[in-house]
Amino acid sequence: MKSLLVVAAVLAVGALAQGDDAKGPKVTDKVYFDMEIGGKPIGRIVIGLFGKTVPKTATNFIELAKKPKGEGYPGSKFHRVIADFMIQGGDFTRGDGTGGRSIYGEKFADENFKLKHYGAGWLSMANAGADTNGSQFFITTVKTPWLDGRHVVFGKILEGMDVVRKIEQTEKLPGDRPKQDVIIAASGHIAVDTPFSVEREAVV
């Protein structure tokens, strides 16, 4: 009887773990971006970060969001915008996609590829190949499975997908560069008292 109870307990724990996993990754922290286009406020984006699944990548993003202008995300641009694909930012050193750096040094290794690009509204690290993560990131505006296993997914939009869409639809110059500067006017960290799961699906 004891052995049967042990087996039942193990199965129950396994079922709970699977159920939790089925709900999706857990948000442990939030970061906000107050956005401007051409100097005019367009709203706030709030991003949930998965600090248990990708702690090193999430911490890098949080710390860069907390830094002052010129040392992190505040004042930096979304320098590359492609409709029906993604919006890319985070190059706070050069502003054109050739710069940026992490809190760990110039670059850091890919943490893992446990999460995928499930649809619009997922946050992932931009890179120049394997193990070249710095500060640049992108937010998907469609499902992008061809990026799975190549870019580290570490967050999801919780609020402000309409702001992401405004950025996506902004007028562009050759090279996918916005005609008017798309600026993170302010950014910061929002603590999460109790981590919560998000679905593995697109943000509407």
From Swiss-Prot:
Record localization: Cytoplasm
CC annotations in GO: cytoplasm; intracellular membrane-bounded organelle
Expression across tissues: Embryonic, larval and adult gut cells.
Domain of life the protein comes from: Eukaryota
Swiss-Prot/TrEMBL keywords: Cytoplasm, Glycoprotein, Isomerase, Rotamase, Signal
Catalyses which reaction(s): [protein]-peptidylproline (omega=180) = [protein]-peptidylproline (omega=0)
InterPro entries (UniProt xref): Cyclophilin-like_dom_sf (IPR029000), Cyclophilin-type_PPIase (IPR024936), Cyclophilin-type_PPIase_CS (IPR020892), Cyclophilin-type_PPIase_dom (IPR002130)
Catalytic activity, EC: 5.2.1.8
Induction / repression: Inhibited by cyclosporin.
Any GO MF annotation of the entry: peptidyl-prolyl cis-trans isomerase activity
Sugar attachment sites: 133
UniProt key word tRNA-binding: no
PROSITE patterns associated with the record: CSA_PPIASE_1 (PS00170), CSA_PPIASE_2 (PS50072)
A Pfam family: Pro_isomerase
Family according to the record: Belongs to the cyclophilin-type PPIase family.
Function: PPIases accelerate the folding of proteins. It catalyzes the cis-trans isomerization of proline imidic peptide bonds in oligopeptides.
PANTHER family (UniProt xref): PEPTIDYL-PROLYL CIS-TRANS ISOMERASE, PEPTIDYL-PROLYL CIS-TRANS ISOMERASE D-RELATED
Protein name: Peptidyl-prolyl cis-trans isomerase 5
Gene: cyn-5
